Amino acid sequence: MSHDNKPTDSTPAASNFLRSIIDQDLAASTYAGRQDKAGEPLPTVITRFPPEPNGYLHIGHAKSICLNFGLARDYGGRCHLRFDDTNPVKEDTEYVDSIIDAVHWLGFSWDSEGKDGTRQPHLYYASDYFDQLYAFAETLIERGAAYIDSQTAEQIAASRGNFSEPGKPSPYRERSVEENLQLFRDMRAGKYADGEHVLRAKIDMTAPNIVMRDPVLYRIRHAHHHRTGDKWCIYPMYDFTHCISDALENITHSLCTLEFENNRPLYDWVLEHLRDSGVFRDPLPHQYEFARLNLTYAITSKRKLKQLVDEQRVDGWDDPRMPTLVGVRRRGYTPESIQLFCDRVGVAKADSWIDMSTLEGAVRDDLDGRAARGVAVLDPLKLIIDNYPEGQSEECSAPVHPKKPELGKRVFPLSRELWIEREDFNETPPKGYFRLFPGNKVRLKYGYVIECTGVDKDADGNVIAVHASYLPETKSGTPGADSVKVKGVIHWVSAAHAYEAEVRLYDRLFNDPNPDAGGKNFLDALNPDSKQVITAYLEPGLREAQPEDRFQFERHGYFVADRTDSQPGKPVFNRIVGLKDSWGK
């Protein structure tokens, strides 16, 4: 099992109670000495990531991916990727492909190395087990542990009771084994319509845990399956499939989010019945629950995310404002930054909210060490250096990365007319303003010291150009660079040489940290300024940026060449994150 990308940060991982559980199992040799069907020794730690292919993965799934693959890596085990594809109505190969791509992008592999050095893939589908699942369901029927219920879904729900009232047994609960087997086989043969019968476990209708009140194990669904086609018209439920798939794959530690805590007794019930029938042997897999990732200023409900897409409130599932992994990838987040974030938040037993600034902080910390630098003017104002020769230009240089001199320098031209940021000039500056204003001197970063000498205005009195003179002996990197002391430094690009680029300034999709809490309409919390498209002027070398190349635009933040809309020689840039958290103010 390989792990290609690892976080660059050396911060220790946050508390992870699951490591203590695994350590105890290793000390007790709980899963030692096992062999697969071929007689090969099995790892003592085998985990799995089991998504349902009914949508795009989001940042919450990244926590589970990093947890399952990370634990397997750290303990010398392996992690399986398994698609829980038991609901043909909602699933599609489009989602299968996107999930495979997302897990690979995060830096993980489900392959292991065989004894002959070959790669052994551990990519599985629950649908591959349909024949076995059906046979195991018949085993439960034969043991008197499952029965066919002919009530409607509404009747079953009503008879299940609630936390204060026990459930009521189905009138079909005492059908004979023979009748149940025949009905189940007729269900498989397609003799009944959807909803006409279900297979239920026969457990305890008075159990305090409502999950254990004769849960449904199989239902009829005449629908085309993305892998098995029309072979099946009955499909197993998640609770039946999940535990059996784990056992078939020799999973040791089955890690789920907290909403499945009440399902753990059913997980154990199914496996123990099949063990007692001789299907499985001890040690059985064990389910453990951890807190899901709840991120402020975001929603992760597939239904609500789909609503945003369907109503065109965002530009698709990979919109850089979306919390989907295809979205954050297009936004410019790196796999390493997401891993770093997951390491920092750790694994807990109780649900909590993680502030978006924690994720953005991990992104900044990762990009600070890897992103090349560049200059961009986002809100341009013309600066004319009147005493600089017309038609002439000269080279200025700056480090590609200030902390990595081995990367060398980048070179860009300075000429008579430049673009500067509009906010770097103020005709009537407030106290403490050290940038450009009439009579003041500032340094053009990597260039000369200049003095503002005047302005041009339009008919409405708006400043449309600033005039200045430069001090020829003050160029950065020359002996005279420090001969004139100034307090202000501004960035710039040559007007004649700059790359005129489309830049998309992305921000948080919601203004409210909890957009759908407490009965709110999450659409009311949409941030109208979450996307601004501007024309900016960039240093000319940025024209050669390739899709997914990341940069720090000095003084502005981190940006990425869009992986979808960039063209050769014409990259489009997305803002990944600012240089500091502006939402914490």
Swiss-Prot record:
<dbReference type="InterPro" id="IPR000924">
    <property type="entry name" value="Glu/Gln-tRNA-synth"/>
</dbReference>
<keyword id="KW-0963">Cytoplasm</keyword>
<dbReference type="InterPro" id="IPR020059">
    <property type="entry name" value="Glu/Gln-tRNA-synth_Ib_codon-bd"/>
</dbReference>
<comment type="subunit">
    <text>Monomer.</text>
</comment>
<dbReference type="GO" id="GO:0005829">
    <property type="term" value="C:cytosol"/>
</dbReference>
<dbReference type="InterPro" id="IPR050132">
    <property type="entry name" value="Gln/Glu-tRNA_Ligase"/>
</dbReference>
<keyword id="KW-0436">Ligase</keyword>
<feature type="short sequence motif" description="'HIGH' region">
    <location>
        <begin position="51"/>
        <end position="61"/>
    </location>
</feature>
<dbReference type="InterPro" id="IPR001412">
    <property type="entry name" value="aa-tRNA-synth_I_CS"/>
</dbReference>
<dbReference type="InterPro" id="IPR049437">
    <property type="entry name" value="tRNA-synt_1c_C2"/>
</dbReference>
<dbReference type="Pfam" id="PF00749">
    <property type="entry name" value="tRNA-synt_1c"/>
</dbReference>
<keyword id="KW-0030">Aminoacyl-tRNA synthetase</keyword>
<dbReference type="InterPro" id="IPR020056">
    <property type="entry name" value="Rbsml_bL25/Gln-tRNA_synth_N"/>
</dbReference>
<feature type="binding site">
    <location>
        <position position="84"/>
    </location>
    <ligand>
        <name>L-glutamine</name>
    </ligand>
</feature>
<dbReference type="InterPro" id="IPR004514">
    <property type="entry name" value="Gln-tRNA-synth"/>
</dbReference>
<dbReference type="GO" id="GO:0006424">
    <property type="term" value="P:glutamyl-tRNA aminoacylation"/>
</dbReference>
<keyword id="KW-0648">Protein biosynthesis</keyword>
<dbReference type="Pfam" id="PF03950">
    <property type="entry name" value="tRNA-synt_1c_C"/>
</dbReference>
<dbReference type="InterPro" id="IPR022861">
    <property type="entry name" value="Gln_tRNA_ligase_bac"/>
</dbReference>
<dbReference type="InterPro" id="IPR020058">
    <property type="entry name" value="Glu/Gln-tRNA-synth_Ib_cat-dom"/>
</dbReference>
<feature type="binding site">
    <location>
        <position position="238"/>
    </location>
    <ligand>
        <name>L-glutamine</name>
    </ligand>
</feature>
<keyword id="KW-0547">Nucleotide-binding</keyword>
<dbReference type="InterPro" id="IPR014729">
    <property type="entry name" value="Rossmann-like_a/b/a_fold"/>
</dbReference>
<dbReference type="GO" id="GO:0006425">
    <property type="term" value="P:glutaminyl-tRNA aminoacylation"/>
</dbReference>
<dbReference type="GO" id="GO:0004819">
    <property type="term" value="F:glutamine-tRNA ligase activity"/>
</dbReference>
<dbReference type="Pfam" id="PF20974">
    <property type="entry name" value="tRNA-synt_1c_C2"/>
</dbReference>
<feature type="binding site">
    <location>
        <begin position="58"/>
        <end position="64"/>
    </location>
    <ligand>
        <name>ATP</name>
    </ligand>
</feature>
<feature type="binding site">
    <location>
        <begin position="292"/>
        <end position="293"/>
    </location>
    <ligand>
        <name>ATP</name>
    </ligand>
</feature>
<dbReference type="InterPro" id="IPR011035">
    <property type="entry name" value="Ribosomal_bL25/Gln-tRNA_synth"/>
</dbReference>
<keyword id="KW-0067">ATP-binding</keyword>
<feature type="short sequence motif" description="'KMSKS' region">
    <location>
        <begin position="299"/>
        <end position="303"/>
    </location>
</feature>
<protein>
    <recommendedName>
        <fullName>Glutamine--tRNA ligase</fullName>
        <ecNumber>6.1.1.18</ecNumber>
    </recommendedName>
</protein>
<comment type="similarity">
    <text>Belongs to the class-I aminoacyl-tRNA synthetase family.</text>
</comment>
<feature type="binding site">
    <location>
        <begin position="52"/>
        <end position="54"/>
    </location>
    <ligand>
        <name>ATP</name>
    </ligand>
</feature>
<feature type="binding site">
    <location>
        <position position="257"/>
    </location>
    <ligand>
        <name>ATP</name>
    </ligand>
</feature>
<dbReference type="GO" id="GO:0005524">
    <property type="term" value="F:ATP binding"/>
</dbReference>
